[in-house]
């Protein structure tokens, strides 16, 4: 089996589906969901589901977001190599309008602490 190593971000995504993207000063009502995200995590999941042995290297906080990452990686058979740092796990606030366009604000949190040395240690 091929092995893929992905180094990147894990975020807890907070998603609001709204009729239109918010303008400055606007208050909107929308449907809310939360779930996993982050470019690195999404790539690791895609690689694993395509059949590759997958190692995901990331930085996480010591919080519920980190617990979510661990549970999801275990469930998908992803070898998670996380480094716990003194910052919250990354988050993203995502607004998606009726046409599917989005606006995203991220709180990088622990993702900003990811270092090349973490990857070297995982290999």
For every predicted segment, state its role:
Residues 1-59, 66-68:
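Glycine-rich phosphate/adenosyl-contacting loop at the front of the ribokinase-like
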Residues 20-23, 71-75, 122:
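Short, solvent-exposed amphipathic alpha-helical segments in soluble enzyme
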Residues 35-42, 85-88, 111-118:
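Short secondary-structure boundary/capping elements
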Residues 63-64, 88:
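Short alpha-helical
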Residues 64-76, 94-96, 100:
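Active-site-proximal loop->helix
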Residues 72-87:
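A glycine-rich helix N-cap at a beta->alpha junction
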